[in-house]
């Protein structure tokens, strides 16, 4: 069982959160600084943690003024994105401002969620997407947002932590092939998710 699961007691009541909200936002901006990686010109991966998920839930609860019962339902949706100690989880966003260009681009990117990978030496770890809803339609159009899991074994965790190994994150879709090298700062930050 994932000991990092978020429960209702981890969420501050809205009245209290409103007082500290501005400071929490500043803290989270700093915390996320080395958790984002651009892969090509329009795709970005935002690597999640227990802290980022609590912040997102807290913000949603505050803005939408949801009830405790609704909050319990939201926890069921958010908890699968908390890394379990042997994985990295990420929200991948395809960010194109122009709506027409975005629609056209996404219509050619079906199945992209199955083509995202972390490369460590000769090892490739392909993402597994959240199964909550299909992110690609039968017509081949994909969503602009994907929730991804990269599963690691002990050997891959050690390889990830080893600073002598170059780590790349890529997408090898036929319509969008890009590879990015992660910095030592990003590696160091993401390695905190492994227990």
Indicate residue ranges for each PLM-predicted region.
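Long, contiguous binding/interaction regions
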Residues: 1-87, 95-195
């Amino acid at each position: 069982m994932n000991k990092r699961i978020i429960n209702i007691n981890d969420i501050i009541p809205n009245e209290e959160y409103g007082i500290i909200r501005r400071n929490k936002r500043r803290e989270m901006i700093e915390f996320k600084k080395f958790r984002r990686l651009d892969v090509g010109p329009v795709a970005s991966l935002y690597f999640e943690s227990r802290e980022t998920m609590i912040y997102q839930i807290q913000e949603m609860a505050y803005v939408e003024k949801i009830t405790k019962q609704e909050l319990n339902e939201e926890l069921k949706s958010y908890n699968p994105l908390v890394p379990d100690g042997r994985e990295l989880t990420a929200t991948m966003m395809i960010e194109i401002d122009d709506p027409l260009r975005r629609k056209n681009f996404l219509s050619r990117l079906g199945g992209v969620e199955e083509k995202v990978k972390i490369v460590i030496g000769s090892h490739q770890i392909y993402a597994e997407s959240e199964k909550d809803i299909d992110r690609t339609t039968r017509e081949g159009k994909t969503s602009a947002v994907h929730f991804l899991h990269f599963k690691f074994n002990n050997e891959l965790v050690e390889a990830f932590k080893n600073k002598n190994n170059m780590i790349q994150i890529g997408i090898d879709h036929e319509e969008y092939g890009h590879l990015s090298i992660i910095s030592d700062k990003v590696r160091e930050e993401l390695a905190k998710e492994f227990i």
